[in-house]
Amino acid sequence: MSEEKNTRTVNGRVVSSKMDKTLTVLVERRVKHPLYGKFIRRSTKLHAHDEGNEGREGDWVSIQECRPLSKNKTWRLVKVLERAAS
């Protein structure tokens, strides 16, 4: 049975690319406050595997969930959507 799982894909901003073959990606989402109804921005930092060291700080990237690659890395870089202004 070769069934592919539906893997999550999210977009975010690269906040660090100092590690070898690893990016830190900030993913923001908007949630509604339960009592007041105001939309609040919440964020999550994820470590993503970058095989070719393509991502640079400030880039807008797409990452996809994958099997655990290390203690903290369970995401893989799919593509760079927009380069940061240099």
Curated annotation (Swiss-Prot):
One of its GO terms (biological process) is translation. Disulfide bonds: none annotated. GO terms for molecular function: rRNA binding; structural constituent of ribosome. Keywords: Ribonucleoprotein, Ribosomal protein, RNA-binding, rRNA-binding. Pfam families: Ribosomal_S17. GO terms for cellular component: cytosolic small ribosomal subunit. Part of the 30S ribosomal subunit. One of the primary rRNA binding proteins, it binds specifically to the 5'-end of 16S ribosomal RNA. Belongs to the universal ribosomal protein uS17 family. This is Small ribosomal subunit protein uS17. It comes from Halorhodospira halophila (strain DSM 244 / SL1) (Ectothiorhodospira halophila (strain DSM 244 / SL1)). The gene is rpsQ.
